């Protein structure tokens, strides 16, 4: 069962964990992975989960099950983190140099999945914010080693130029007659 937003939802900064959270009513809190240094100033105080946030979240709930084969709980977790990343994280400068250039031109939009190639590893990424030449993506794979000293884990965000986004390949089945 997918969790639908209601009037009791609001964003909070969890002082104990030093992370953004969302209160889902009087007895439930969802802790995002986003720490203080990544957040916009408004995210450090209680903030309404407004209509725009709800529309984005619901769009993610509708889109993600069509492209990801994960549990309902995983869909909700991904949608909540994507909503937090879209509205409450500071903007970033592109860090495209970590990723290989794609040979194909892609159409990029929020909610679309792409592959990022980093050396020998390939990671799944969800577009959470899109600009004219670059997109902020949220990593959906468990881990991505960018360099000897830098790595990304699931739900981390990074901004990359559109030419680094590789389209997902669909498995093709050849049937011989």
Curated annotation (Swiss-Prot):
Residue spans crossing the bilayer: none
Alphabetical UniProt keywords: Cell cycle, Cell division, Cytoplasm, Septation
Superkingdom, natural source: Bacteria
Gene Ontology annotations of biological process type: division septum assembly; FtsZ-dependent cytokinesis
UniProt main location, coarse: cytoplasm
GO cellular component, one term: cytoplasm
Cellular location(s): Cytoplasm
UniProt function note: Contributes to the efficiency of the cell division process by stabilizing the polymeric form of the cell division protein FtsZ. Acts by promoting interactions between FtsZ protofilaments and suppressing the GTPase activity of FtsZ.
Family the entry assigns: Belongs to the ZapC family.
UniProt subunit comment: Interacts directly with FtsZ.
Protein name, per record: Cell division protein ZapC
Gene label: zapC
